């Protein structure tokens, strides 16, 4: 609990109380879609449904049918989801939910979601299928800020969900 207070103060100081986290669906120049997030703990199923709708409207690659989506999901590798010194038993509880870029419902459903990437992938696939499409999903490493500045940005923002302001999100953690 003490560590959360320090983290909260640091976040407020560096980002400000009105900062909002973004989750984005972008189309790359080659037509591939990418889902990338900043760790919004309040991203929910309704937001995921809106991302699926946006993906279905664009398709996934040049020449692909409107019902096919080729999606790359930028997510941290599993070994980064928890601090190294956390006891594995703590990971089952809601307070031990993994820290990810694309958390759905705070990565907790009563207890912690043990594999949030698989949960997101499964729910996204179900939503695309429900809408009559098909999807190929691939997990990729997030691009660092230095790598991002070196790339040409020919991507097109298709949909964005923004979090509540930082001051409201902090009440979820404390």
Language-model segments: what does each one mean?
Residues 1-2, 117:
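Short, conserved glycine- and acidic-residue-centered signature motifs
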Residues 13-174:
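Conserved serine DD-peptidase/penicillin-binding transpeptidase domain
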């Amino acid at each position: 609990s003490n560590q959360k207070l320090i983290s909260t103060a640091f976040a407020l100081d560096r980002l400000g109380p009105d900062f909002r986290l973004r989750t984005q669906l972008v189309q790359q120049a080659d037509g591939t879609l990418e889902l990338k997030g900043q760790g919004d703990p309040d991203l929910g199923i309704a937001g995921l449904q809106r991302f699926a709708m946006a993906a279905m409207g664009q398709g996934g690659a040049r020449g692909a049918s409107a019902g096919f989506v080729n999606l790359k999901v930028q997510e941290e590798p599993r070994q980064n989801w928890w601090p190294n010194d956390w006891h594995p038993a703590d990971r089952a509880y809601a307070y031990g939910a993994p820290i990810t870029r694309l958390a759905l419902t705070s990565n907790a459903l009563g207890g912690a979601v043990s594999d949030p990437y698989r949960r997101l992938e499964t729910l996204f696939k179900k939503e695309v299928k429900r809408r009559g499409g098909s999807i190929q999903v691939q997990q990729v490493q997030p691009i660092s800020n230095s790598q991002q500045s070196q790339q040409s940005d020919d991507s097109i923002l298709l949909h964005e969900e923004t979090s509540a302001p930082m001051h409201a999100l902090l009440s979820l953690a404390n």
